[in-house]
């Protein structure tokens, strides 16, 4: 008899969790509190309590080829970076292709998830839901929480003395939808993450002046990278990931600074991060430097105090006649339907094994999907999480002891702090390629490079030097997809397809890049064996 699994949320994590459950022969039921799929990526004009919210102009920060699910490439005519409506279209195509909607109960709110009295032996959960004012309860063999972490706004008003005196308008960035109504105003945006930067840029085109306050500074990257390719298809390769892991810390920090400053000198713009950490999640925005050059946006330090109409900053400067303050200060974790002890966040540390499993449960029948912030696309990340989780639920994969899991949680947190810092916004940060490989290894889907070097050297070179895409994790192991190799080698074609809207005369060049990659791979292998010989 198939195990019954409760999937909470029908956003990206919920949809892929449904598919993974079906692939493994489990019986899923998804509870979605709204009337449609898409989660945070479905734009609505009205902000709803308990639901993630985006502004109308949101475009993905990760490209389509690095964001698609591993056995379902996005249509080749889709743009590389998708408007939220286009991404929602992909989710609809995906849900229809794999017939997922029949598993979803819409407009159904999960009120509570509690262990059954015999949990220590059964591992079962009692899930109480509400729909149309009527409560129902059901018992499930396992639970997958797929609600994400972008719906409870974090507004640290106590950190802004004088906010109670401020006569202008202030609100969290989740309430921002479009620039209408802000024309001619002087606006202060607090927080320079992706949302804060996007909003500042958009408002700067019609506002009188926009100021953006950043505590530590930030790196700003363009979506356009080498030779015009999407940034993540160049940045996220196994070769680059290996270099970051084996080179000394000071060298890695220098390399990152050089790479980030290729586009523009961040120090000259007052943006260079002022901390000791190797990595800080960059802001993806193609317009920030130009808006700074135009004077439409001005970078400010931390707000020290607010008056009725002005903002006083830590460097002693004052900006008068502020009309609006927008807090782009992130989100707090909240799972009101869970017991407090189930998913604990203490001192900015999430007590989940590999950001997924509570370590203290007697039975491994509960998991969080998508509760992570990788330096890359969340979609392939959530998919690998769900693939592993469903195999754990089936008993095909097993978790280590509680002690081993707790040691991993502590060690992972120490590494996260060393790389990214201790602030709340960095709580879920992790290295992208390393984490994907880690999950793939658990399910037996990580590519075997030593074997591929002899069996399929062309593929081995592509996997090592090319983009670390999701297709790689369908080449072998459970869930193998026969189209994976072809998808890897036709990736460039799908990247360029939406750009080639003007016919040009054909020109061919000698493929020296492939030969250089072969030589580079040989050099890496030789260096590795030499190191073994001398160690």
Swiss-Prot record:
InterPro entries: FAD/NAD-bd_sf, Flavin_mOase, Flavin_mOase-like, Flavin_mOase_2, FMO-like. GO terms for cellular component: endoplasmic reticulum membrane; membrane. It is found in: Microsome membrane; Endoplasmic reticulum membrane. The modification N-acetylalanine is found at residue 2. Signal peptide: none annotated. Keywords: Acetylation, Endoplasmic reticulum, FAD, Flavoprotein, Isopeptide bond, Magnesium, Membrane, Microsome, Monooxygenase, NADP, Oxidoreductase, Transmembrane, Transmembrane helix, Ubl conjugation. There is a cross-link at residue 492 (Glycyl lysine isopeptide (Lys-Gly) (interchain with G-Cter in SUMO)). SUPFAM superfamilies: FAD/NAD(P)-binding domain (SSF51905). It is a single-pass membrane protein. It catalyses: N,N-dimethylaniline + NADPH + O2 + H(+) = N,N-dimethylaniline N-oxide + NADP(+) + H2O. GO terms for molecular function: flavin adenine dinucleotide binding; N,N-dimethylaniline monooxygenase activity; NADP binding. The chain crosses the membrane at residues 510-530. Its cofactor is FAD; Mg(2+). Its EC number is 1.14.13.-, 1.14.13.8. Its main location: membrane. NADP(+) binds at residues 60-61, 195-198. It is an enzyme of class 1 (oxidoreductase). It comes from the Eukaryota. Catalyzes the oxidative metabolism of numerous xenobiotics, including mainly therapeutic drugs and insecticides that contain a soft nucleophile, most commonly nitrogen and sulfur and participates to their bioactivation. Belongs to the FMO family. This is Dimethylaniline monooxygenase [N-oxide-forming] 2. It comes from Macaca mulatta. The gene is FMO2.
């Amino acid at each position: 008899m198939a195990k019954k699994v409760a999937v909470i949320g029908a956003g990206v994590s919920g949809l892929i969790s449904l598919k993974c459950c079906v692939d493994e022969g489990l019986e899923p039921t998804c509870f979605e509190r709204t009337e449609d799929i898409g989660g945070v990526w479905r734009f609505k004009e009205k902000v709803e309590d308990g639901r993630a919210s985006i502004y109308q102009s949101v475009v993905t920060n990760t490209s389509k080829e690095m964001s698609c699910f591993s056995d379902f490439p996005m249509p080749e005519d889709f743009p590389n970076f998708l408007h939220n409506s286009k991404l929602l279209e992909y989710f609809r195509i995906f849900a229809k292709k794999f017939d997922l909607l029949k598993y979803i109960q819409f407009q159904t709110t999960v009120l509570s998830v509690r262990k059954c009295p015999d949990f220590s032996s059964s591992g079962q959960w009692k899930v109480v839901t509400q729909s149309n004012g009527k409560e129902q309860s059901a018992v499930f063999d396992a639970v997958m929480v797929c609600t994400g972490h972008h719906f409870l706004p974090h507004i640290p008003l106590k950190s802004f003395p004088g906010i109670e005196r401020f006569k202008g308008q202030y609100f969290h960035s989740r309430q921002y939808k479009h620039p209408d109504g802000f024309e001619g105003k002087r606006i202060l945006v607090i927080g320079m993450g992706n949302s804060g930067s996007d909003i500042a840029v958009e408002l700067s085109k019609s506002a009188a002046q926009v100021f953006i306050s950043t505590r530590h500074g930030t790196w700003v990257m363009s979506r356009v990278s080498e030779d015009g390719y999407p940034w993540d298809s160049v940045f996220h390769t196994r070769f680059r990931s290996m270099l970051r892991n084996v080179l000394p810390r000071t060298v890695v920090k220098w390399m990152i600074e050089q790479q980030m400053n290729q586009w523009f000198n961040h120090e000259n713009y007052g943006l260079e991060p002022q901390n000791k950490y190797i990595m800080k999640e960059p802001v993806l925005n193609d317009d920030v430097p130009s808006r700074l050059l135009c004077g439409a946006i001005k970078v400010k330090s931390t707000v020290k105090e607010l008056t009725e109409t002005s903002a006083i900053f830590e460097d002693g400067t004052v900006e008068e006649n502020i009309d609006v303050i927008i807090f782009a200060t992130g989100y707090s974790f909240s799972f009101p339907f869970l017991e407090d002890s189930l998913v604990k966040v203490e001192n900015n540390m999430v007590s989940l094994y590999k950001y997924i499993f509570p370590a203290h449960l007697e039975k491994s029948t509960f998991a969080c999907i998508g509760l992570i912030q990788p330096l890359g696309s969340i979609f392939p990340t959530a998919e690998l999480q769900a693939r592993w989780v469903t195999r754990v639920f089936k008993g095909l994969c097993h978790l280590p002891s509680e002690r081993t899991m707790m040691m991993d949680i502590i060690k992972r947190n120490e590494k996260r702090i060393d790389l990214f810092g201790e602030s709340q916004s960095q709580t879920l940060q992790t290295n992208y390629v390393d984490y994907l490989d880690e999950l793939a290894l658990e399910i037996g889907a990580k590519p075997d490079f030593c074997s591929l070097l002899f069996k399929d050297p062309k593929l081995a070179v592509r996997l090592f030097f090319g983009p670390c895409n999701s297709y790689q994790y369908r080449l072998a192991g459970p869930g193998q997809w026969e189209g994976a190799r072809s998808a890897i080698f036709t990736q460039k074609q799908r990247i360029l397809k939406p750009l080639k809207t003007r016919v040009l005369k054909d020109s061919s060049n000698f493929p020296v890049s492939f030969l250089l990659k072969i030589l580079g791979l040989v050099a890496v292998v030789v260096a590795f064996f030499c190191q073994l010989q001398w160690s």
